[in-house]
Regions:
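Loop-to-helix transition at the N-terminal end of transmembrane alpha-helices
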Residues: 42-61
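Helix-loop-helix hairpins and the membrane-proximal interhelical loops
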Residues: 1-47, 161-162, 194-285, 428-430
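Membrane-embedded alpha-helical modules
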Residues: 91-205, 209, 327-435
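Internal alpha-helical transmembrane segments of multi-pass membrane proteins, especially GPCRs
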Residues: 50, 100-103, 251, 289, ...
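Residue-level signature of catalytic and energy-coupling elements of molecular machines
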Residues: 17, 37, 121, 190, ...
Length: 435
């Protein structure tokens, strides 16, 4: 396997196979969970199951071959939630137009990925703001998980309140959350999918959900959602008039995907010391290039933006050091295409607990934030709080970047207001102008 330079990376096929399997086990939950989230955009669930598996296969294998890094890729949960609840339900966009937005943001990412733009972003944007973005998205998707399980419900006086805990479906969600946290805390490999399966079995036994009539079948067609991108609805309103109202949304998808990828890869590097030399940094650059291409491809397949998955760290810790690990992970996902009846039978309240714990894990990056600095403290707080409260990643980003720039200006800390911050503040203003 000279292509992957196994000897140079002090690994072998057996180790890479085991690492790929480990990564697959830790992230298999993404197939039913992402399909469930995107189904709220009125997209067919069966096609979404297949499309999620297919883009995971293609993006992971492509990264393994292009970048030779053990980083698996799949659809990002934060942007999937924003796609369904922010664009389709919130802005009343057809899902075809939302896919067009995903494609345009992916195209921007591809163009800029082969320039020095990424390194410029890493230098110009404070690490604390990148952490705030990750934590804000974590709070956003955790809130969605609690909302969809009806653990948190609407209230006329207080906007939100606790749900009806006498409802067995709500209790099932609570059990799922406790079980998922317990298994993850015990560091059991595959804790997410194990918790989903146990909670599902409990739901089937208690007749809270129908038992699967079959476990295996041929893959569902993705034709209802593939190649369904609509660009006209992005730049022209219902009356046919030209509009730029959705430009900030396109930029939001791009910026969020960029930060998500950088944060994930930085996290893997922090956990495993994987990107600590010049050669590895070159591989990191190529991984970001693969991520950009995959993001564009995801819209074509019919799902939201792809990103590098932090679960790849489990494979790296298992010994994975080359792209062969990512290739094996992608190939393992082929199996999920033939398990669609089983995946369809999993009740939503067995899946959404995973969304809550993923949100918690994303939120944990705040431990490195310098809260002694007022600009950092306020911008972090507003980013994290405003994403779930406004039900919008774009609004959260805008509040965070604007507050950071304004406070640094008041503090006369002009060195902190670099070109990157100025551009992001201008973009943030446009978020409110083009509402």
């Amino acid at each position: 396997m000279g292509f992957f330079k196994l000897k140079e990376h002090n690994t072998n096929i057996t180790t890479e196979f085991r690492a790929g399997l480990t990564t697959f086990i830790t992230m298999i939950y993404i197939v039913p969970l992402n399909a469930l989230i995107l189904s709220h955009a009125n997209m067919p669930y069966e096609a979404l199951l297949s499309a999620t598996a297919i883009i995971t296969i293609l993006s992971s294998v492509f990264n393994g071959l292009w970048a030779n890094t053990p980083i698996a890729m799949s659809v990002g949960l934060g942007l999937s939630a924003y796609f369904s609840f922010g664009l389709v339900q919130g802005l009343k966009l057809p899902w075809q137009s939302a896919l067009g937005i995903v494609a345009l943001s992916g195209a921007i990412f591809v163009i800029l990925s082969f320039t020095k733009f990424r390194s410029w972003v890493m230098r110009s944007i404070p690490s604390d703001l990148r952490r705030a973005v990750s934590a804000g998205i974590g709070a956003f998707i955790a809130f969605i998980g609690l909302k969809e399980m009806h653990i948190v419900v609407t209230h006329k006086a207080t906007l939100v309140t606790l749900g009806d805990f006498s409802d067995p479906h709500v209790l099932l969600g609570v059990v799922g959350i406790v079980l998922t946290f317990a298994l993850y805390t015990l560091k059991i490999k595959g804790s997410f999918i194990i918790a989903v399966l146990i909670t599902s079995i409990l739901a089937w036994v208690l007749k809270l959900a129908p038992y699967p009539s079959e476990f295996f079948s041929m893959p569902a067609s993705i034709s209802p959602i593939a190649f369904q991108l609509d660009f006209k609805g992005i730049f022209f309103d219902a009356s046919g008039a030209f509009t730029l109202a959705l430009v900030p949304v396109i930029i939001t998808f791009f910026v969020t995907d960029l930060f998500d990828s950088l944060g994930t890869l930085a996290g893997i590097g922090h956990k495993t010391d994987f990107f600590n030399d010049e050669e590895k940094n070159k591989e990191l650059e190529r991984t970001l290039e693969a991520d950009a291409v995959a993001s564009l491809g995801s819209a074509v397949v019919g799902v939201s933006t792809t990103t590098a998955f932090i679960e790849s760290a489990s494979g790296v810790e298992e010994g994975g050091r080359t792209g062969l690990t990512a290739v094996f992970t992608g190939l393992f996902f082929v199996l999920t295409l033939f398990c669609l009846p089983l995946l369809k039978a999993i009740p939503s309240n067995a899946i959404y607990p995973v969304l809550v714990i993923v949100g918690v894990l994303m939120f944990s990056v705040l431990e490195g934030v310098n809260f002694k600095d007022m600009a950092t403290s306020v911008s972090t707080f507003l980013t994290v709080v405003m994403m779930p409260l406004t039900f919008s990643i774009a609004d959260g980003l805008a509040f965070g970047f604007l507050s950071y720039g304004i406070i640094k200006l008041v503090q006369k800390d002009f060195k902190a207001i670099n070109s990157g911050i100025i551009i992001l503040c201008i973009i943030s203003v446009s978020v409110f102008i083009f509402r």
